[in-house]
């Protein structure tokens, strides 16, 4: 940066140039006494020089976090999200999944975890103006076979689910051609997959979403209690690799997790009867929780109709357990042949 741009007495500027200092940043690399020796300026002139250089680099004023947030239109890449394919759920999650970081999705069986993951695998293929990233997805199965039948059902219903996108656009997307499926039944295979195979797809732009279904299965079946230290070390290694991939390629990572019952005393259990979801905790403990940017949890409960006494359709709820940009909140949703839809007016904060 040119020294003539500094608001200084010409005498000070000339002395700086005689000292062979060529930039403002170079000036700030020296202490006051060193600048005095290089330029021959007195102490008060050197202080004026340092102050002018600091003000020039700092800019006109200090920017607060609120100001940067309000300028998000000027930095669209930093605020981009991956849509879930449902406007209600997108609004609930502040636009969708963050592009950088690991999102954990935990919940009991039949709550809709895999359904949501499959819906994201389709949503990521849409153009950016429709919440997608115009790329495919990597789906890593660790316990069950890939649900291809359900995937084809969702593909066939995309025109009914994604009413925001033109039908011509949906017809052009070859959804099934851009979902890359891997099976990893043990920890070593999973680590090899995310460290060698997945980076190739991400670096070539063929995929921009990574799904692991589920993260807990290989760790829970391979390690006993005495091997908890080894398990923690491997979990940290896996988390670091997934975070690095997400940050390098700006691709969201969704890790589906199982749940375990929390151990409580008899008094606590008796108080929480009828609220079983409050006694469930995501598996793998604090070691894995520290790897996540955002943790979501889904649950599925049955309620009886007050008038008839017959069981109603199951009530499913998506909850935000922690996230740096979202409050603790919940939203109800339904699972149908078309996919997952949020229920308007059910958000609670």
UniProtKB/Swiss-Prot annotation:
Keyword Acetylation carried by entry: yes
Gene Ontology MF, one: ATP-dependent DNA damage sensor activity
Binding of ATP, residues: 107-114
Keyword ATP-binding belongs to the record: yes
Residues recorded with modification N-acetylmethionine: 1
Swiss-Prot/TrEMBL keywords: Acetylation, ATP-binding, Cytoplasm, DNA damage, DNA recombination, DNA repair, DNA-binding, Mitochondrion, Nucleotide-binding, Nucleus
Cellular localisation: Nucleus; Cytoplasm; Cytoplasm, Perinuclear region; Mitochondrion matrix
GO biological process: double-strand break repair via homologous recombination; interstrand cross-link repair; positive regulation of mitotic cell cycle spindle assembly checkpoint; regulation of centrosome duplication; resolution of mitotic recombination intermediates; t-circle formation; telomere maintenance via recombination
GO cellular component, one term: mitochondrial matrix
Function: Involved in the homologous recombination repair (HRR) pathway of double-stranded DNA, thought to repair chromosomal fragmentation, translocations and deletions. Part of the RAD21 paralog protein complex CX3 which acts in the BRCA1-BRCA2-dependent HR pathway. Upon DNA damage, CX3 acts downstream of RAD51 recruitment; the complex binds predominantly to the intersection of the four duplex arms of the Holliday junction (HJ) and to junctions of replication forks.
Subunit field text: Interacts with RAD51C and RAD51. Part of the CX3 complex consisting of RAD51C and XRCC3; the complex has a ring-like structure arranged into a flat disc around a central channel; CX3 can interact with RAD51 in vitro. Forms a complex with FANCD2, BRCA2 and phosphorylated FANCG. Interacts with SWSAP1 and ZSWIM7; involved in homologous recombination repair. Interacts directly with PALB2 which may serve as a scaffold for a HR complex containing PALB2, BRCA2, RAD51C, RAD51 and XRCC3.
PANTHER family tied to this protein: DNA REPAIR PROTEIN XRCC3 (PTHR46487:SF1)
Entry similarity comment: Belongs to the RecA family. RAD51 subfamily.
Identification of the protein by name: DNA repair protein XRCC3
């Amino acid at each position: 940066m040119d020294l003539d741009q500094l608001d200084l007495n010409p005498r000070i500027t000339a002395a700086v140039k005689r000292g062979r200092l060529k930039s403002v940043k170079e000036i700030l690399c020296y202490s006051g006494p060193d600048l005095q020796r290089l330029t021959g300026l007195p102490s008060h002139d050197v202080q004026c020089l340092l102050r002018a250089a600091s003000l020039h680099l700092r800019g006109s004023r200090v920017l607060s976090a609120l100001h940067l947030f309000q300028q998000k239109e000027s930095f669209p890449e930093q605020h981009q999200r991956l849509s879930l394919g449902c406007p209600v759920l997108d609004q609930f999650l502040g636009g969708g999944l963050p592009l950088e970081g690991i999102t954990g999705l935990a919940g009991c069986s039949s709550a809709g975890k895999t359904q949501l993951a499959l819906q994201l695998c389709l949503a990521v293929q849409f153009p950016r103006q429709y919440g997608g990233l115009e790329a495919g997805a990597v789906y890593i199965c660790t316990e069950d076979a890939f649900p291809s039948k359900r995937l084809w059902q969702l593909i066939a219903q995309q025109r009914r689910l994604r009413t925001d996108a033109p039908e011509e656009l949906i017809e052009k997307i070859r959804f099934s051609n851009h979902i890359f499926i891997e099976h990893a039944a043990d920890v070593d295979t999973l680590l090899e997959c995310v460290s060698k195979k997945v980076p190739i797809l991400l670096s070539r732009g063929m995929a921009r979403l990574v799904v692991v279904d589920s993260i807990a299965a290989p760790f829970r079946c391979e390690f006993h209690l005495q091997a908890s230290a080894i398990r923690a070390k491997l979990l940290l290694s896996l988390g670091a690799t997934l975070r690095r991939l997400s940050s390098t390629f700006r691709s969201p990572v969704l890790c589906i997790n199982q749940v375990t019952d929390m151990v409580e005393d008899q008094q606590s259990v008796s108080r929480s009867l009828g609220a079983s979801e409050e006694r469930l905790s995501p598996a793998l403990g604090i070691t894995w929780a520290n790897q996540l940017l955002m943790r979501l949890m889904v649950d599925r409960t049955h309620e009886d109709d007050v008038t008839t006494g017959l069981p109603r359709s199951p009530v499913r709820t998506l909850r935000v357990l922690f996230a740096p940009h979202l409050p603790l909140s919940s939203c109800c949703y339904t699972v149908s042949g078309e996919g997952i839809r949020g229920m308007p007016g059910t958000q609670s904060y």
